[in-house]
């Protein structure tokens, strides 16, 4: 099971690389936000998960897979290019611009809310015009001028390269978050599930898989 960002931009490459090593491997990839993936893990619907937020360290093993960062995505137009030329950071635009938000329960939303608290702000202070559970739909809305959004740098990499979107670092030190591989502490994995976990915990194998995404 995988939450939205790893499920779209990381896990397919990981599983494809593992399948080359283990041709008999078969899997079903279930999607949800980070909270839903935790629930699926606890209920036994999945044995291995990928999430962008830690919520139950007493019951769940979290292995850091990927260092992601969150950026403020904006349309590539004259208005936002002027901010870029002035060296403006994303946090300076959060309270000023219409905002398209991820759904509550997503790792991205959790990371953003934690970040806002460090600034003495809350999500309620943003000019939220929509809550959307799909980064691809959010990117379309942002490029169409609906507002700005805080998204994974992974999610907007292609659009930034082709000039559809601009990506602003949130502040000088960047807003980082970790994508985790999760398993239940109390669960015994099958032989193939354990092989997958061991494969993903190998840094050089993981890097090769990430290059396929």
Question: What is each PLM-predicted segment?
Answer:
Residues 10, 166-210:
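A late-sequence structural motif
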Residues 33-38, 42-46, 51-52, 113-117, ...:
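Hydrophobic hinge/microswitch elements
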Residues 60-100, 104:
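Flexible hinge/capping segments at coil-to-helix
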Residues 81-84, 98-120, 189-193, 197, ...:
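Secondary-structure junction motif
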């Amino acid at each position: 099971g995988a939450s939205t960002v790893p499920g779209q931009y990381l896990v397919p490459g990981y599983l494809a690389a593992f399948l080359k090593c283990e041709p008999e491997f078969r899997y079903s990839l279930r999607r949800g936000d980070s909270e839903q993936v935790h629930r699926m893990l606890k209920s036994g619907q999945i044995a291995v998960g990928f999430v962008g937020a830690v919520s139950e360290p007493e019951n769940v093993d979290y292995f850091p897979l990927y260092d992601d960062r969150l950026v403020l995505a904006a349309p590539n137009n004259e208005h936002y290019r002027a901010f870029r030329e002035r060296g403006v950071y994303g946090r300076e635009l959060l309270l000023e611009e219409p905002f398209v938000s991820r759904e509550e329960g997503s790792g991205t939303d959790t990371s953003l809310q934690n970040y806002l608290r460090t600034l003495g702000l809350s999500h309620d202070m943003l000019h939220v015009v929509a809550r959307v559970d799909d980064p691809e739909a959010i990117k379309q809305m942002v490029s169409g001028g609906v507002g700005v959004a805080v998204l994974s740098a992974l999610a907007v990499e292609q659009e930034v390269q082709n000039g559809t979107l601009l990506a602003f670092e949130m502040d000088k030190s960047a807003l980082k978050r970790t994508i985790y591989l999760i398993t239940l502490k109390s669960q015994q994995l099958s032989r193939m599930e354990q092989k997958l976990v061991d494969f993903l915990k190998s840094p050089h194998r993981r890097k090769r898989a990430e290059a396929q995404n």
